[in-house]
Amino acid sequence: MERKLNFIENKKLKNYDPKNYKEGYLKIGKLIVTYIYRKDKIKLDGTQSHPCYLYGYGSYGVIDDPTFDKYTMSLVDRGYLYCIANLRGSKFYGPKWYHEGKYLKKKNTFKDFQTIAQYLIHQNYTSPDKLVVEGGSAGGLLIGSCINMNPSLYHVAVLRVPYVDCLTTLLNPDLPLTIGEYNEWGNPGKYKTYYDYILSYSPYDNIDLKKQYPHIYIDTGLHDSQVIFHEPLKYYAKLTHNQHFQQNTRTLLFNIRTQSGHSGSSKRYQQIIDETQVLTFILKQNK
């Protein structure tokens, strides 16, 4: 029996024509990067580098399927190459791929993300002075770890409700979600092997006060029960002692959303305001 898809409905959006955009994917070994760009703004042939936004998560088996997003299009319409990285720690290739990016193999997630960033630069699709990276929650841990490992690779880093003081959190079983997190990261309070491994990549614990970091935007929700606001705040406070942020050669911005939780605000227009603030930061630093 032949199977086919039937077209049911097409919702037309103002100021949007899908014919203006090119979608596709890059394959870097087993790593898959999905992308979208505007045809009249970008030629993806390596002859010229472009501003690039690279998103990553890579935890809990979550697969980042590309979906239409009005905030994405705001960057794409301004000439950005918009990319989503599928990393070990997701289930993009199934359970084995997930297990290759958790517990004592968590650093594989960070290696994958950096491999993708380096590939985009090597192919001259972008350059270190044009590359924006973003991750939220466990994706914030990803970004925080990567900018510690190789800060010169990125120009702007956006960390949304980031899980950046992971070791301290995992050592406190009285917090509501800690015990459940042992299934993803391990139990550092019980096993020294996990303690040492998590310590080696924890974004907060590995901040370098002398290195030049990218421009950094951090946000948190005052009512976040998953990554409690004091965790990103503690991370921000330590970063303020970095000599380049003190000398204002790099921008460091912390935004606490007083009416938001882990997934943002439930108010009708507040999400638009919140996302506009992030886009403004990116565009201002990535002129």
Language-model region placement:
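Structured, non-catalytic alpha/beta "coupling" segments that mediate domain-domain communication
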Residues: 1-5, 164
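Conserved long hydrophobic alpha-helices within structured protein cores
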Residues: 2, 29-35, 226-234
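A structure-centric signal for secondary-structure junctions around beta-strands
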Residues: 2, 30, 49-50, 154, ...
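Cap/lid segment of the alpha/beta-hydrolase catalytic domain
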Residues: 6-132, 136, 171-172, 259-260
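Active-site-proximal cap/loop segments of hydrolase catalytic domains
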Residues: 87-287
